[in-house]
Amino acid sequence: MLRLDMLRYRSGMEGAWGRVYGGRWKYDGNGIGTKENYWAGEAGYDRRYPNNWRAGISLDYRDGKGKYDFGGRGDSKLYALSLYGSKDLTRGAFVDMVVKGGYIKNKFTLYDRGRNQFTGSSTARGYSVAGRYGKRFGTGDFYWQPQIQFTWAHLEPDEYDVSNKSAVMTVKGQSFDSYVARAGIEAGRIGSFGDLYVRAGIAHEFGGRIKASYSAADGGTKETSYDLKDTWGELTVGGTYNLSPVSRIYIDVTRGFGGDWKREWQLNAGFRCEF
């Protein structure tokens, strides 16, 4: 929803934009420890439409380097296409929507407790739909804005091989559905030079069960299931700077708190040009 935050209460009929971002997420639960450092780039274009709508399209690429238990590592790449829109409901209220589709590839090397090495690669397609409602209050240059958001995400089932020097194992991952609800508040100051803001929120995962089966060449099978239900918080501090009446840059940093899964940090930097 970051793209839509930057659109709100800005002038201009049409605009092109781009951003780069990077960070690290971490998961430590169900006896599993993993983290990933990533960087990404995104670019898009949007314009105004009748009835107080603004909508656009964007392309996103992300490269990640993962670290797993016992020294394992992974190299992931994500490619995604997004359609987004925002409607001004007047009197400070708004609704945002984002639909995204793409796929992620991961090439990995794993180790067990005995330091046996296993290698493999996987590819999964995914989709997500997010909606948010909020309302801005305030007078003069200062404002505060409560908001609620719900996101559904889906990963399709995937099948791939994991091998070492002496054996091959087939992994069948079942489809995965995530249902995340967020509630938060943003406060800031709007000035002629740009904006300053701070955003705090709490999120809860209602779904997030991962299931997979493992089949060895000798006929042995095993199944695993992990419940990723969790609650965590996030804090963002950032601002924008107006380069001209039709162009601006922005930067912000986000930190996650609590929960087995969290975004330890993320740094965003980008620009927008209207014409």
Give, region by region, the residue ranges found by the protein language model.
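Outer membrane beta-barrel transmembrane domains
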Residues: 82, 87, 167-275
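Short, structured loop/turn "capping" segments at alpha-beta junctions
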Residues: 140-145, 155-159, 192-196
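Generic multipass alpha-helical transmembrane bundles of integral membrane proteins
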Residues: 149-151
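Solvent-exposed, glycine/polar-rich loop segments of beta-barrel outer-membrane systems
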Residues: 30-37, 69-71, 105-123, 154-177, ...
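Short hydrophobic/aromatic-rich motifs at helix boundaries and adjacent loops
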Residues: 13-17, 53-57, 156-158, 208-209, ...
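Outer membrane beta-barrel translocator domains of Type V secretion systems
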Residues: 1-147, 252-266, 270-273
